[in-house]
């Protein structure tokens, strides 16, 4: 009975969520697009000509937002792919419906076959921005969940270390709770500038937050 009440409460909040309605109206696949939008507007992350990698991209709302931003910043004299000034590569183990001008690679980005496909698209270029809305399946057991969250952040940090430009940036989703301070310390070890971000589009009840790291301390 309690579970049913929880599901009904979540459904009510979801249906009446202004960001859900806005996403439906503006064609985004998920309300998460507005989290990236708010952070981008604050920190000026996405700019014309960039190479952007979206980790754990499905269903694709972050890639959609990045694509729309690079389309708006298109220059007439720019060398571009399709309708954008820049390159967006979306990676996920899950399938994802195509997005115009976005390269999608399905698979585990730790595997050689996926990395080979990534390198083919990069064609020798380094990455300007890595964005990750990845989240593990949470069990409700604090210690276990903290380890899973830290592991996902570690994967993004390792990917960024291997592919970012020295002045590049990494934005990852995280959660306040046990282990959060350790994740922040790892960011500070890897990046010169580290800042937490809690966009208004994140639900008030959620412990979800984001960590932004800029400028690698030890470029590869």
UniProtKB/Swiss-Prot annotation:
Which GO molecular function annotations are given, in alphabetical order? rRNA (uridine-2'-O-)-methyltransferase activity
SUPFAM superfamilies, per the entry = S-adenosyl-L-methionine-dependent methyltransferases
- Superkingdom, natural source: Bacteria
Question: Which InterPro entries does this one have?
Answer: RNA_methyltr_RlmE, RNA_MeTrfase_FtsJ_dom, rRNA-MeTfrase_E, SAM-dependent_MTases_sf
Alphabetical UniProt keywords: Cytoplasm, Methyltransferase, rRNA processing, S-adenosyl-L-methionine, Transferase
> What chemistry does it catalyse, as a reaction equation?
uridine(2552) in 23S rRNA + S-adenosyl-L-methionine = 2'-O-methyluridine(2552) in 23S rRNA + S-adenosyl-L-homocysteine + H(+)
Asked if S-adenosyl-L-methionine is a keyword of the record, the answer is: yes
Coarse class of the primary localization is: cytoplasm
Under Enzyme Commission nomenclature, its number is 2.1.1.166
Q: Read off the Pfam families from this record.
A: FtsJ (PF01728)
User: What is the main EC category here?
Assistant: transferase
Localisation per UniProt entry: Cytoplasm
Q: Which family does it belong to?
A: Belongs to the class I-like SAM-binding methyltransferase superfamily. RNA methyltransferase RlmE family.
Task: State the name under which the record lists this protein.
Answer: Ribosomal RNA large subunit methyltransferase E
Q: Which organism is it from?
A: Burkholderia thailandensis (strain ATCC 700388 / DSM 13276 / CCUG 48851 / CIP 106301 / E264)
Upper lineage: Bacteria, Pseudomonadati, Pseudomonadota, Betaproteobacteria, Burkholderiales
Q: Which gene encodes it?
A: rlmE
